[in-house]
């Protein structure tokens, strides 16, 4: 299913993002002077299952999760430098059941162990001065996308 996700908004997914699902987030532009840009994968109960915070000013990408009214867990960080290539950066997230696999522009994968074992029902996109276009497209499907009709 294809969604158009505008900055400072979220989309409710038609079907849960669950194990064996893939979400491909694609931007039509890259703002090299952009600031902190965040994508959150949210459960139906609004728990943040996967928090991806891209912070170019700190040269870091942070991964985390938290219960709706809980505290953030320990941050997991990787360097930001050279993760995105203009003009059309992308982020791909694969749910493997016990962990998420995250790829930036089809580069090396990062693995984030799930701390909250729920399915995502929505994806949120937040920024004041986004690195990416508004909207971004979000394509959510199974590991093998359905074949077109014959």
UniProtKB/Swiss-Prot annotation:
Function: Binds lactose. May play a role in fruiting body formation. Displays toxicity towards the nematode C.elegans by binding to a specific Gal-beta-1,4-Fuc-alpha-1,6 modification of N-glycan cores on C.elegans intestinal cells.
Effect of residue 147 to S: Reduces the stability of the tetrameric structure
Major localization class: secreted
Cell location: Secreted, Extracellular space, Extracellular matrix; Secreted, Cell wall; Endomembrane system
Complex and partners: Homotetramer. Oligomerization is required for carbohydrate binding.
Ranges of residues in domain Galectin: 9-141
Result for mutant: residue 146 to G: Reduces the stability of the tetrameric structure
Protein name: Galectin-2
Gene Ontology MF annotations: carbohydrate binding
Keyword Transcription listed: no
Leader sequence segment: none
Gene that this polypeptide is encoded by: Cgl2
Taxonomic superkingdom: Eukaryota
Key words of the record: Cell wall, Extracellular matrix, Fruiting body, Lectin, Membrane, Secreted
InterPro entries the UniProt entry points to: ConA-like_dom_sf, Galectin_CRD
GO cellular component terms attached to this protein's record: endomembrane system; extracellular region; membrane
Residues where a carbohydrate binds: 51, 55, 64, 75, 77
């Amino acid at each position: 299913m294809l969604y158009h996700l505008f900055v400072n908004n979220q989309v409710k997914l038609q079907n849960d993002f669950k194990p064996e699902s893939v979400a491909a987030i694609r931007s039509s532009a890259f703002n090299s002077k952009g600031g902190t840009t965040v994508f959150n994968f949210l459960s139906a109960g609004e728990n943040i299952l996967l928090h991806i915070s891209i912070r170019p000013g700190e040269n870091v990408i942070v991964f985390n999760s938290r219960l709706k009214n809980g505290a953030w867990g320990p941050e997991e960080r990787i360097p930001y430098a050279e993760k995105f290539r203009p003009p059309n950066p992308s982020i791909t997230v694969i749910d493997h059941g016990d962990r998420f696999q995250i790829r930036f522009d089809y580069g090396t994968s990062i693995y984030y162990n799930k701390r909250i074992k729920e399915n995502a029902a929505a994806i949120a996109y937040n920024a004041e001065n986004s690195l990416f276009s508004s909207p971004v497209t979000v394509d959510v499907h199974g590991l093998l996308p359905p074949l077109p009709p014959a």
